[in-house]
Amino acid sequence: MNQKTILVLLILAVITIFALVCVLLVGRGGDGGEPSQLPHCPSISPSAQPWTHPGQSQLFADLSREELTAVMRFLTQRLGPGLVDAAQAQPSDNCIFSVELQLPPKAAALAHLDRGSPPPAREALAIILFGRQPQPNVSELVVGPLPHPSYMRDVTVEHHGGPLPYHRRPVLFQEYLDIDQMIFDRELPQASGLLHHCCFYKRRGRNLVTMTTAPRGLQSGDRATWFGLYYNISGAGFFLHHVGLELLVNHKALDPAHWTIQKVFYQGRYYDSLAQLEAQFEAGLVNVVLIPDNGTGGSWSLKSPVPPGPAPPLQFYPQGPRFSVQGSRVASSLWTFSFGLGAFSGPRIFDVRFQGERLVYEISLQEALAIYGGNSPAAMTTRYVDGGFGMGKYATPLTRGVDCPYLATYVDWHFLLESRAPKTIRDAFCVFEQNQGLPLRRHHSDLYSHYFGGLAETVQVIRSMSTLLNYDYVWDMVFHPSGAIEIRFYATGYISSAFLFGATGKYGNQVSEHTLGTVHTHSAHFKVDLDIAGLENWVWAEDMVFVPMAVPWSPEHQLQRLQVTRKLLETEEQAAFLMGSATPRYLYLASNHSNKWGHPRGYRIQMLSFAGKPLPQNSSMAKGFSWERYQLAVTQRKEEEPSSSSVFNQNDPWAATVDFSDFINNETIAGKDLVAWVTAGFLHIPHAEDIPNTVTVGNGVGFFLRPYNFFDEDPSFYSADSIYFRGDQDAGACEVNPLACLPQAAACAPDLPAFSHGGFSHN
C-alpha cells in the first residue's frame, strides 16, 4: 500500500469519526443522553400578589400584621396597665388571649358586593381572660373600625347570654409549662425508685414528656386533666412510647402552688398518689413492666432507611399558571373565591362564584372531634374538640413538593394568639391547579359513527393543614370544571397510643411490644351557606322506589318499575338527619327559578363519609358536640347562629357554650336563606400499618356540592381544554386536536424555585 493510499484512508477515517461524533451528540441531545438546553416555560410569579387597591375581596381577608398590631395597641391602652402578656400570664392575671377577624354581617356584605353600598366596618374580635377580677371571667370584645380602631364593645352577653365562666377558658401554653414544672420538679421525685427501675428516669434530665387529654374533668366547673407520660424521643414521634404512667392533675386553683395530683394510674392499677405508688413498689407489690427506650431506631422514625431514588413525577404549567392569587382572593377563568383561616375553627371560603355567578356565600370548617376508647383513664376519657386547641392556631407551614405540588402558590397567615405581637405562619395555604389524571367526561364511539370526545379533568385546589398534638389534618377545597365543589379532609400523623395491658382486644390492636393503638372516631363539621340563584331557597329530597305493575303488553306478567320519589322538606326537623338514619340519596337546595327545561335550579349535597357512631345522647357531655349526631341538617340562616361550636366547648362540654341542637327548632325552611350543616367522619381502629404514621389513603372523607338542574347542560362543554376528533380526521394535526400541539407547547423546562420550608417557630 503506497503512501498516497494510506493518507486517503486516514482522511476518510477522520471524516467518519467526526460524523459519528456528531450523530452521537445529536442523539444524546434528543434521546436520553445529556439533554439539550430547553427554554424555560413562560410563567407568572408563583407567589401570591398583595392587594393593589382597596376592593370588595378584602371583606373576608384575615387581619394583617398591621391591623393586629393596631388592635393590640388599642386594647392595651383601653384595658389599662393590669394586662399581662399571655405568653407569661398566670391564671390569676388579665391577658389578651386572641385577636382575629370579626366577620361582617351577611346583609351588609352583600349590599356592598352586589349593590355597591359602602363596605361594612372592618372589625376584630378579641378574647380577654380576666383572671384578676373579683369574679374571674372570659369576655369577648369587638374592636373597630380597622385599620384605625376607635371603639370597642363587649359582646359577651350578646353572643352567649351572660358572662363566660373562667373555668371554660382554653389552657394557655404557660399553664402547660407550670403543670410540667409541677409534675417533674415536685411530683415525680416522689416515685424516683420506680421510675429509675422502669423508665431510665433522670431527674431534671427530662427523658420523659407529658401529653394532655381533654376534656378536663367529669362535670361542669372541673379543671382536672389526665396527662400521659412518654419517652422523650428526639426526632421521632413520642406518641408511640407510652411508659404506662398517667397522672390526674387538678389545676383549677388560680395559684399553681395549690395544684395537686388527684389520682395516679400505673400499668393497669390506680393509686392515690405517687408516694403511695413508690411505697408499694419498694414493698414489692407493683408488677413493673420494663419499657425499653428505643431511641429513633426501628419503625418509629419518619427518616427513610433507604437512599433517595429517581425524582418523582412533577406537574407544571407549560404556558404559565391559569389562575391568580391577590391577597386572599383566588381567580381563574371559571372560579373566584376569597379564603381565610379562623384561629380556632380553621379554613373557610367566601363569595364563591362560578362563571361570575355566586353559588356559595360561605363554606367553613366549624369543628373537628376525636373520641377515644381504651382501658386506661387517659384513653377512655379523651374527647378532643380541636377547636378548643385551635385549628388555625396549629396550622403548619406546607412543605413544597410533599404537602402540595412543588409549583403551587404559597400564602402566609398572620395571627395573634397568646402573644403581644402578631406572628406569621409561612406557607400556611397553597393554591394550585391539578390535572387529576382522569377524564372528567369522555366517549369513544365505534357504533354507527366513529369519533372521540372528552375532557381531562383539571381542578383548582386550596389547601391548609393543622397539626393537633399527634394528628395532622389535611383540609382541601376543590373546584371542578363541571361547577362542582368538593370539600374533603384527610387524617395522617401519629396515632395516639396507650400502654398495653389486660384485655386490649376491645380497644384496638397491638402495634408494638408494649403499645396499644387505641380505637377512635374522627369527625368534622362544616357550615355550607349556599345561595342558589338568590337568597330564597327550598330543600328537596329525591330517592327511588320500585313499584309493581302489570306488563302493559302482557298483563299476566308482573314488572317492578323503578320510579323517582320527590318530597319538599318544609321545616328544620324534616331536614335534620341523624347519624345512621336513612338519608335521601338526593338532597338539594333549589331556587324558585327554573332552568331551560322547567326544573328548579339546584345544588345537591352528596356525602362521602363513613362516620362512626356518635356519642350517646344520654352522655353528660353530648351537648358539647351535639352536631356530631347529625350527618346533615338544614336550618334558617341567622346572624346569631354563626358557628356550630365554640372554643370554650372543649373545657366545659357539660354546659356547652354553643349547643348545635338548639339551632334545630322546627322553623320553616321554605323560601328562606338557608345553611346546610354537614358532618363527615370515619372510624379508625389502628393497626400495624399505622406505624410509623397513618396514611391518607382511605382516610379521607367529605362531601360534594354538585349542580342539579342548575344549568341547562354540563358547563364543562364550553371548556377550551375539550378534545374532539372524528375517525376521518387526522388526530395528530394541531388544528384538529390541541393535544397534538403539546410536544411543542410543553417543550420547555419548568422554572423551579429553590426549596424552602416555613420553619418550626412562628415570627
Curated annotation (Swiss-Prot):
Catalyzes the oxidative deamination of primary amines to the corresponding aldehydes with the concomitant production of hydrogen peroxide and ammonia. Has a preference for the primary monoamines methylamine and benzylamine. Could also act on 2-phenylethylamine but much less efficiently. At endothelial cells surface can also function as a cell adhesion protein that participates in lymphocyte extravasation and recirculation by mediating the binding of lymphocytes to peripheral lymph node vascular endothelial cells in an L-selectin-independent fashion. It is found in: Cell membrane. Disulfide bonds join 198-199, 404-430, 734-741. This is Amine oxidase [copper-containing] 3. Belongs to the copper/topaquinone oxidase family. It comes from Pongo abelii. It is a single-pass type II membrane protein. Residues 1-5 are cytoplasmic. Ca(2+) 2 binds at residues 572, 641, 663, 665, 667. GO terms for biological process: amine metabolic process; cell adhesion; response to antibiotic.
